[in-house]
Amino acid sequence: MKKLLALFVIAPILISCTSNKNSEYREEYIKDTNGFDILMGQFAHNIENIWGLHEVLIAGPKDYVKYTDQYRTRSHINFEAGTITIETISPIDPTTYLRKAIITTLLMGDDPGSVDLYSDTNDIQISKEPFLYGQVMDNNGQPIRWEWRATHFADYLIANKLQKRQSGLHVIWSVTIQLVPNHLDKRAHKYLPLIRQASIKYGIDESLILAIMQIESSFNPYAVSRSDALGLMQVVQHTAGRDVFKMKGKSGQPSRSYLFDPENNIDAGTAYLSILQNSYLVDITNATSRRYAVITAYNGGAGSVLRVFSSDKKKAAQIINKMAPGDVYETLTTKHPSAESRRYLMKVNTAQKGYHH
Protein backbone atom coordinates (compact mmCIF):
# COMPACT_ATOMS: atom_id res chain seq x y z
CA MET A 1 0.00 0.00 0.00
CA LYS A 2 1.35 3.37 -0.94
CA LYS A 3 1.70 5.78 1.90
CA LEU A 4 -0.06 9.11 1.58
CA LEU A 5 2.67 11.67 1.11
CA ALA A 6 2.22 15.06 2.70
CA LEU A 7 1.24 17.75 0.25
CA PHE A 8 4.78 18.95 -0.37
CA VAL A 9 3.89 21.04 -3.35
CA ILE A 10 3.74 24.60 -4.57
CA ALA A 11 1.16 25.65 -7.08
CA PRO A 12 2.53 27.30 -10.20
CA ILE A 13 -0.46 29.59 -10.45
CA LEU A 14 0.01 31.21 -7.07
CA ILE A 15 0.10 34.97 -7.36
CA SER A 16 3.39 36.54 -6.33
CA CYS A 17 2.96 39.29 -3.80
CA THR A 18 4.72 42.50 -4.71
CA SER A 19 3.52 44.94 -2.05
CA ASN A 20 6.27 47.01 -0.47
CA LYS A 21 4.33 47.49 2.74
CA ASN A 22 4.99 44.69 5.18
CA SER A 23 1.45 44.54 6.56
CA GLU A 24 -0.06 44.45 3.09
CA TYR A 25 2.50 41.89 2.02
CA ARG A 26 1.72 39.58 4.96
CA GLU A 27 -2.01 39.86 4.30
CA GLU A 28 -1.53 39.01 0.63
CA TYR A 29 0.77 36.13 1.50
CA ILE A 30 -1.85 34.66 3.82
CA LYS A 31 -4.39 34.89 1.00
CA ASP A 32 -1.96 33.18 -1.38
CA THR A 33 -1.22 30.45 1.17
CA ASN A 34 -4.91 29.80 1.74
CA GLY A 35 -5.46 29.64 -2.01
CA PHE A 36 -2.52 27.28 -2.35
CA ASP A 37 -3.90 24.94 0.33
CA ILE A 38 -7.25 24.84 -1.48
CA LEU A 39 -5.60 24.14 -4.84
CA MET A 40 -3.42 21.38 -3.44
CA GLY A 41 -6.35 19.85 -1.61
CA GLN A 42 -8.15 19.72 -4.94
CA PHE A 43 -5.08 18.26 -6.65
CA ALA A 44 -4.80 15.50 -4.05
CA HIS A 45 -8.54 14.85 -4.26
CA ASN A 46 -8.31 14.50 -8.04
CA ILE A 47 -5.44 12.02 -7.75
CA GLU A 48 -7.44 10.06 -5.17
CA ASN A 49 -10.45 9.98 -7.50
CA ILE A 50 -8.31 8.53 -10.28
CA TRP A 51 -5.97 6.22 -8.32
CA GLY A 52 -8.07 5.47 -5.26
CA LEU A 53 -7.72 5.81 -1.52
CA HIS A 54 -4.18 5.34 -0.15
CA GLU A 55 -2.69 5.87 -3.61
CA VAL A 56 -2.16 9.63 -3.50
CA LEU A 57 1.43 10.44 -4.39
CA ILE A 58 2.61 14.03 -4.82
CA ALA A 59 6.01 15.65 -5.31
CA GLY A 60 8.02 16.69 -2.26
CA PRO A 61 11.52 17.84 -1.28
CA LYS A 62 13.00 14.37 -1.78
CA ASP A 63 10.37 12.89 -4.08
CA TYR A 64 10.01 13.58 -7.79
CA VAL A 65 6.52 12.63 -8.96
CA LYS A 66 5.33 13.25 -12.52
CA TYR A 67 1.95 12.20 -13.92
CA THR A 68 1.16 11.59 -17.61
CA ASP A 69 -1.53 9.82 -19.64
CA GLN A 70 -4.47 11.71 -18.10
CA TYR A 71 -2.91 11.12 -14.66
CA ARG A 72 -3.05 7.33 -15.12
CA THR A 73 0.73 6.84 -15.35
CA ARG A 74 3.32 8.23 -12.96
CA SER A 75 7.05 8.26 -12.36
CA HIS A 76 8.28 8.48 -8.78
CA ILE A 77 11.93 8.98 -7.86
CA ASN A 78 12.54 8.64 -4.14
CA PHE A 79 15.90 10.37 -3.76
CA GLU A 80 16.24 9.37 -0.12
CA ALA A 81 15.48 5.65 -0.56
CA GLY A 82 17.25 5.51 -3.93
CA THR A 83 14.40 4.02 -5.95
CA ILE A 84 12.53 4.79 -9.16
CA THR A 85 9.00 3.42 -9.42
CA ILE A 86 7.04 3.69 -12.66
CA GLU A 87 3.35 2.82 -12.32
CA THR A 88 0.23 2.84 -14.47
CA ILE A 89 -3.45 2.10 -14.01
CA SER A 90 -4.13 2.40 -17.72
CA PRO A 91 -6.69 -0.29 -18.59
CA ILE A 92 -5.57 -0.48 -22.20
CA ASP A 93 -2.05 -1.64 -23.13
CA PRO A 94 -0.45 -0.65 -19.79
CA THR A 95 3.03 -1.84 -20.77
CA THR A 96 3.16 0.69 -23.61
CA TYR A 97 2.62 3.54 -21.14
CA LEU A 98 5.11 2.03 -18.69
CA ARG A 99 7.72 1.68 -21.41
CA LYS A 100 7.37 5.30 -22.49
CA ALA A 101 7.50 6.58 -18.91
CA ILE A 102 10.59 4.50 -18.10
CA ILE A 103 12.47 5.84 -21.13
CA THR A 104 11.45 9.44 -20.47
CA THR A 105 12.37 9.28 -16.79
CA LEU A 106 15.78 7.72 -17.42
CA LEU A 107 16.65 10.35 -20.04
CA MET A 108 15.14 13.50 -18.50
CA GLY A 109 17.40 16.51 -18.02
CA ASP A 110 17.90 18.59 -14.89
CA ASP A 111 15.89 21.66 -15.87
CA PRO A 112 13.02 21.72 -13.35
CA GLY A 113 11.76 25.03 -14.69
CA SER A 114 10.57 23.33 -17.88
CA VAL A 115 8.53 20.60 -16.16
CA ASP A 116 5.11 21.05 -14.56
CA LEU A 117 4.76 18.45 -11.82
CA TYR A 118 1.12 19.36 -11.28
CA SER A 119 -0.27 18.52 -14.70
CA ASP A 120 -0.30 15.42 -16.87
CA THR A 121 1.43 17.24 -19.73
CA ASN A 122 4.24 15.18 -21.18
CA ASP A 123 6.65 18.13 -21.06
CA ILE A 124 9.80 16.24 -20.10
CA GLN A 125 12.53 16.78 -22.66
CA ILE A 126 14.89 13.91 -23.41
CA SER A 127 18.39 15.19 -22.70
CA LYS A 128 21.81 14.34 -24.09
CA GLU A 129 23.03 14.78 -20.50
CA PRO A 130 20.38 12.88 -18.49
CA PHE A 131 20.00 13.92 -14.87
CA LEU A 132 20.09 10.27 -13.77
CA TYR A 133 23.19 9.41 -15.85
CA GLY A 134 25.52 7.39 -13.64
CA GLN A 135 22.85 7.02 -10.95
CA VAL A 136 21.19 4.09 -12.73
CA MET A 137 22.83 1.08 -14.37
CA ASP A 138 21.03 -1.09 -16.90
CA ASN A 139 20.81 -4.89 -16.80
CA ASN A 140 24.31 -5.05 -18.33
CA GLY A 141 25.76 -2.77 -15.66
CA GLN A 142 26.07 0.19 -18.03
CA PRO A 143 25.09 3.83 -17.39
CA ILE A 144 22.23 5.12 -19.53
CA ARG A 145 22.81 8.13 -21.76
CA TRP A 146 21.25 7.22 -25.10
CA GLU A 147 17.68 6.47 -26.09
CA TRP A 148 18.51 3.07 -27.55
CA ARG A 149 20.02 1.91 -24.26
CA ALA A 150 17.09 3.28 -22.25
CA THR A 151 14.70 1.52 -24.65
CA HIS A 152 16.50 -1.81 -24.30
CA PHE A 153 16.48 -1.47 -20.51
CA ALA A 154 12.77 -0.59 -20.50
CA ASP A 155 12.03 -3.70 -22.56
CA TYR A 156 14.13 -5.81 -20.18
CA LEU A 157 12.31 -4.42 -17.12
CA ILE A 158 8.87 -5.05 -18.59
CA ALA A 159 9.83 -8.59 -19.63
CA ASN A 160 11.53 -9.52 -16.35
CA LYS A 161 10.56 -7.15 -13.53
CA LEU A 162 6.92 -6.28 -14.17
CA GLN A 163 4.80 -6.23 -11.01
CA LYS A 164 1.03 -6.31 -10.69
CA ARG A 165 -1.14 -5.48 -7.69
CA GLN A 166 -4.77 -4.75 -6.98
CA SER A 167 -5.72 -1.51 -5.23
CA GLY A 168 -9.43 -0.97 -4.88
CA LEU A 169 -10.94 -1.12 -8.33
CA HIS A 170 -7.60 -0.70 -10.10
CA VAL A 171 -4.92 -3.07 -11.27
CA ILE A 172 -1.61 -1.23 -10.86
CA TRP A 173 1.25 -2.31 -13.12
CA SER A 174 4.73 -1.21 -12.07
CA VAL A 175 8.47 -1.63 -12.32
CA THR A 176 10.99 -0.54 -9.70
CA ILE A 177 14.57 0.44 -10.48
CA GLN A 178 17.28 0.77 -7.84
CA LEU A 179 19.64 3.71 -8.00
CA VAL A 180 23.33 2.90 -7.53
CA PRO A 181 24.43 2.70 -3.86
CA ASN A 182 26.34 6.01 -4.03
CA HIS A 183 23.57 7.91 -5.85
CA LEU A 184 23.65 10.72 -3.27
CA ASP A 185 27.36 11.36 -3.90
CA LYS A 186 26.78 11.21 -7.66
CA ARG A 187 24.18 13.98 -7.45
CA ALA A 188 26.28 16.04 -5.06
CA HIS A 189 29.24 15.84 -7.42
CA LYS A 190 27.19 17.40 -10.23
CA TYR A 191 26.83 20.59 -8.23
CA LEU A 192 30.35 20.90 -6.77
CA PRO A 193 31.50 23.65 -9.19
CA LEU A 194 28.45 25.77 -8.31
CA ILE A 195 28.91 25.06 -4.60
CA ARG A 196 32.58 26.09 -4.73
CA GLN A 197 31.66 29.24 -6.62
CA ALA A 198 29.06 30.21 -4.01
CA SER A 199 31.36 29.24 -1.14
CA ILE A 200 34.08 31.62 -2.34
CA LYS A 201 31.62 34.39 -3.19
CA TYR A 202 29.90 34.44 0.20
CA GLY A 203 32.52 33.01 2.57
CA ILE A 204 30.47 29.97 3.56
CA ASP A 205 32.11 26.58 4.10
CA GLU A 206 31.50 24.14 1.23
CA SER A 207 30.75 21.38 3.72
CA LEU A 208 27.90 23.40 5.22
CA ILE A 209 26.35 24.11 1.81
CA LEU A 210 26.58 20.41 0.92
CA ALA A 211 25.09 19.33 4.26
CA ILE A 212 22.14 21.69 3.94
CA MET A 213 21.48 20.55 0.36
CA GLN A 214 21.56 16.92 1.49
CA ILE A 215 19.11 17.43 4.34
CA GLU A 216 16.83 19.82 2.45
CA SER A 217 16.47 17.95 -0.84
CA SER A 218 18.89 15.00 -1.17
CA PHE A 219 20.26 17.01 -4.12
CA ASN A 220 16.90 16.91 -5.93
CA PRO A 221 16.71 19.97 -8.23
CA TYR A 222 12.96 19.40 -8.65
CA ALA A 223 12.38 19.75 -4.88
CA VAL A 224 9.17 21.46 -3.78
CA SER A 225 7.57 21.86 -0.39
CA ARG A 226 4.35 22.80 1.32
CA SER A 227 6.14 25.68 3.03
CA ASP A 228 6.74 27.31 -0.38
CA ALA A 229 10.40 26.23 -0.43
CA LEU A 230 11.91 25.50 -3.83
CA GLY A 231 14.90 23.77 -5.35
CA LEU A 232 18.10 22.21 -4.09
CA MET A 233 18.46 24.41 -1.00
CA GLN A 234 14.71 24.80 -0.49
CA VAL A 235 14.74 28.58 -0.66
CA VAL A 236 11.48 30.26 0.36
CA GLN A 237 10.59 33.06 -2.04
CA HIS A 238 8.91 35.44 0.40
CA THR A 239 11.45 35.19 3.28
CA ALA A 240 15.00 34.13 2.37
CA GLY A 241 14.38 35.04 -1.27
CA ARG A 242 13.34 38.60 -0.41
CA ASP A 243 16.31 39.03 1.95
CA VAL A 244 18.73 37.86 -0.73
CA PHE A 245 17.21 40.13 -3.38
CA LYS A 246 17.40 43.06 -0.96
CA MET A 247 21.08 42.27 -0.32
CA LYS A 248 21.65 42.27 -4.08
CA GLY A 249 19.84 45.60 -4.48
CA LYS A 250 16.86 44.02 -6.22
CA SER A 251 13.22 44.66 -5.40
CA GLY A 252 10.60 42.01 -4.74
CA GLN A 253 11.38 38.33 -4.56
CA PRO A 254 12.77 35.63 -6.86
CA SER A 255 10.36 33.80 -9.14
CA ARG A 256 9.79 30.06 -9.16
CA SER A 257 11.71 29.70 -12.42
CA TYR A 258 14.62 31.68 -10.94
CA LEU A 259 14.85 29.39 -7.91
CA PHE A 260 14.46 26.21 -9.96
CA ASP A 261 17.68 27.07 -11.79
CA PRO A 262 20.38 25.16 -9.83
CA GLU A 263 22.95 27.95 -10.09
CA ASN A 264 20.50 30.58 -8.87
CA ASN A 265 19.23 28.33 -6.11
CA ILE A 266 22.66 27.50 -4.72
CA ASP A 267 23.64 31.17 -4.97
CA ALA A 268 20.48 32.30 -3.16
CA GLY A 269 20.69 29.64 -0.45
CA THR A 270 24.35 30.39 0.22
CA ALA A 271 23.70 34.14 0.16
CA TYR A 272 21.02 33.64 2.81
CA LEU A 273 23.47 31.66 4.95
CA SER A 274 25.85 34.63 4.70
CA ILE A 275 23.06 37.01 5.76
CA LEU A 276 22.38 34.86 8.81
CA GLN A 277 26.09 34.58 9.60
CA ASN A 278 27.17 38.15 8.95
CA SER A 279 24.04 40.12 9.81
CA TYR A 280 21.28 38.51 11.86
CA LEU A 281 23.60 36.41 14.05
CA VAL A 282 26.83 38.40 13.74
CA ASP A 283 26.92 39.23 17.46
CA ILE A 284 27.63 35.59 18.30
CA THR A 285 31.42 35.62 18.59
CA ASN A 286 32.35 31.93 18.72
CA ALA A 287 32.45 30.52 15.19
CA THR A 288 31.14 27.09 16.20
CA SER A 289 28.30 28.51 18.29
CA ARG A 290 27.39 30.83 15.44
CA ARG A 291 27.41 27.91 12.99
CA TYR A 292 24.93 26.03 15.18
CA ALA A 293 22.75 29.14 15.31
CA VAL A 294 22.99 29.68 11.54
CA ILE A 295 22.00 26.09 10.78
CA THR A 296 19.00 26.25 13.08
CA ALA A 297 18.02 29.67 11.73
CA TYR A 298 18.14 28.41 8.13
CA ASN A 299 15.27 26.14 9.10
CA GLY A 300 13.28 28.21 11.59
CA GLY A 301 14.49 31.80 11.38
CA ALA A 302 17.07 33.83 13.31
CA GLY A 303 14.51 35.36 15.65
CA SER A 304 13.36 32.02 16.99
CA VAL A 305 16.98 30.98 17.60
CA LEU A 306 17.74 34.06 19.69
CA ARG A 307 14.45 33.82 21.61
CA VAL A 308 15.53 30.43 22.92
CA PHE A 309 18.05 32.34 25.03
CA SER A 310 16.29 35.69 25.61
CA SER A 311 13.45 37.80 24.24
CA ASP A 312 16.03 40.59 23.85
CA LYS A 313 18.25 39.95 20.81
CA LYS A 314 21.35 41.68 22.19
CA LYS A 315 21.00 39.91 25.52
CA ALA A 316 20.51 36.59 23.73
CA ALA A 317 23.83 37.01 21.91
CA GLN A 318 25.54 37.93 25.19
CA ILE A 319 24.17 34.81 26.86
CA ILE A 320 25.31 32.64 23.96
CA ASN A 321 28.78 34.21 24.08
CA LYS A 322 29.16 33.12 27.71
CA MET A 323 28.32 29.53 26.84
CA ALA A 324 30.54 26.76 25.50
CA PRO A 325 29.65 25.74 21.92
CA GLY A 326 28.58 22.31 23.15
CA ASP A 327 26.11 23.91 25.54
CA VAL A 328 24.73 26.09 22.73
CA TYR A 329 24.20 22.94 20.65
CA GLU A 330 22.55 21.17 23.57
CA THR A 331 20.24 24.12 24.21
CA LEU A 332 19.19 24.48 20.57
CA THR A 333 18.55 20.75 20.17
CA THR A 334 16.49 20.49 23.35
CA LYS A 335 14.92 23.91 24.03
CA HIS A 336 14.05 25.30 20.60
CA PRO A 337 10.22 25.42 20.36
CA SER A 338 10.18 23.72 16.95
CA ALA A 339 10.82 19.98 16.97
CA GLU A 340 11.68 20.23 13.28
CA SER A 341 14.36 22.85 13.96
CA ARG A 342 15.79 20.78 16.82
CA ARG A 343 16.12 17.75 14.55
CA TYR A 344 17.37 19.90 11.69
CA LEU A 345 20.46 21.04 13.60
CA MET A 346 21.27 17.45 14.52
CA LYS A 347 20.87 16.23 10.94
CA VAL A 348 22.84 19.02 9.26
CA ASN A 349 25.62 18.91 11.85
CA THR A 350 25.99 15.15 11.33
CA ALA A 351 25.86 15.48 7.54
CA GLN A 352 28.46 18.27 7.55
CA LYS A 353 30.97 16.04 9.33
CA GLY A 354 30.73 13.65 6.37
CA TYR A 355 31.86 16.37 3.95
CA HIS A 356 34.98 17.43 5.83
CA HIS A 357 38.10 16.24 4.06
Curated annotation (Swiss-Prot):
It is found in: Cell outer membrane. CDD domains: LT_MltC_MltE. SUPFAM superfamilies: Lysozyme-like. Pfam families: Mltc_N, SLT. Its EC number is 4.2.2.n1. It is a lipid-anchor. Keywords: Cell outer membrane, Cell wall biogenesis/degradation, Lipoprotein, Lyase, Membrane, Palmitate, Signal. GO terms for cellular component: cell outer membrane. Residues 1-16 form the signal peptide. InterPro entries: Lysozyme-like_dom_sf, Murein_transglycosylaseC, Murein_transglycosylaseC_N, Transglyc_AS, Transglycosylase_SLT_dom_1. GO terms for biological process: cell wall macromolecule catabolic process; cell wall organization; peptidoglycan metabolic process. GO terms for molecular function: hydrolase activity, acting on glycosyl bonds; peptidoglycan lytic transglycosylase activity. A lipid is attached at residue 17 (N-palmitoyl cysteine). A lipid is attached at residue 17 (S-diacylglycerol cysteine). It catalyses: Exolytic cleavage of the (1->4)-beta-glycosidic linkage between N-acetylmuramic acid (MurNAc) and N-acetylglucosamine (GlcNAc) residues in peptidoglycan, from either the reducing or the non-reducing ends of the peptidoglycan chains, with concomitant formation of a 1,6-anhydrobond in the MurNAc residue. Belongs to the transglycosylase Slt family. Murein-degrading enzyme. May play a role in recycling of muropeptides during cell elongation and/or cell division. This is Membrane-bound lytic murein transglycosylase C.
